[in-house]
Amino acid sequence: MSEKIYFEPTWELPNPFYKADGSIMSTKAEWEEKRKAYLELLSEMYYGKMPGRPQTLTASELSNETICQNTVCHKVVRLCAQGEEAPVFFNVHVYRPVMPCEEKLIPVVIPAANTLPGEIISMAAEQGFEICSFEIAEAAPDDKEKIWEGGCAKAYPGYTWRALAMWAWLQSRVIDWLETQKDIDVTKTVVTGHSRMGKAALCCGIYDERAAVVAPAGSGCGGMASMRLSGCRLGENIGLSERIGVMLNKERFPYWLMENVADYGTPDGKNRFRENEIPFDANILGACVAPRRLILVEGLDDDWINPFGTQVSWLAASEVFEFLGVKEHSAIHYREGGHAYTKQDWSVVLDFTKVQLCGKEKTTGYKSMRENENKAGYSWRCPKTNN
């Protein structure tokens, strides 16, 4: 573990405000140094080390058609990222409003969702958003054996990255391509995704600072749900939600994250569970997005995804946003229902983006951390800053 991370095993959510010597930070510059240390730790212990920007990125258009009653142009673009040992090919599905907008379009980049419902595409287009989704089957297939035969693994064989990091890397390559496009405001890029792709979107948003809004939906374990604390909407049914050891079990998804992190969530004969020994938790993942924007959209009945653990992690992450003077940059929205990325969820993400990046009035009911918020899962608080 990095010597820059001070940590004592605890079942509370880890305190991100400790400096390396165990004292509490008091400046924003100290947080930025701590954030860099966390990024190194996550590469070492969680996501694996991923490569940087490729040597070259080229694009070719495969198809172009109008959909949604001729209101949206859907084109398929094939990207080729030149890796160290081989090229990485993957397709991007672009959904652009046909009618010109008053301002440059805001790009929303989402992974592995080229079959988006028409109502979502239409709603986004009506509000001035361009959606770019991409395919993963060729570059990083979601399979514990095939993924090592995909384009990402072959192009960068010397890296320890796992599936979530590969998908996040592909998401960043879409942003690379967007930077070459006219009529796009790439400074307002949103990265999002649902479930396992929400986990990947969070990873992308942590490492790629071009992501102005990071919007994981129902991301659960490996995303914004705590590895230490779990429960349903009221904190009941502790133990019902997915744990890191279960998720990374060799019969399920051992290729999503680094293998050693699974050991903390797997009984070893001496200790039942050891997630308290992990020097970070989901609140640290969310905090690493700050001071940019973070919005979570969740279902109250999505028990396997750990609604309680997500809520407390979000609150704890919001302490860092408050420390940086931007607590309104962190928000969460719960709806009735289960595991899905619904039209209501999308409406919240788009509204939050317009409020935060375009100065529009808020029209949906997401929340940010309030003054004197009732906290759970941690006893520490945001320290006062000297700048």
Each model region followed by its residue ranges:
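Mobile cap/lid helix-loop segments that gate and shape the active-site cleft of serine hydrolases
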Residues: P216-L285, N306-W314, E322-V326
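Aromatic-residue-lined binding/catalytic grooves and analogous aromatic/hydrophobic interfacial grooves
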Residues: V92-P100, D176-L178, G265, G269
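Cap/lid segment of the alpha/beta-hydrolase catalytic domain
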Residues: K104-T180, G220-S230
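Primarily recognizes the serine-hydrolase "nucleophile elbow" in alpha/beta-hydrolase
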Residues: R173-R243, R274-E277
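Loop/turn elements at helix/coil->beta-strand transitions in domains of secreted/extracellular proteins
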Residues: E103-V108, Q127-E130, V186-K188, E209-V213, ...
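Generic beta-strand/beta-sheet core signal
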Residues: F134, T192-H194, P216-A217, V297-G299, ...
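Alpha/beta-hydrolase-fold serine-hydrolase catalytic core, especially in secreted/extracellular enzymes
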Residues: M1-N91, R96-C101, E209, M258, ...
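Flexible loop/turn segments at secondary-structure boundaries
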Residues: L116-G118, A139-D142, G198-A200, C221-S226, ...
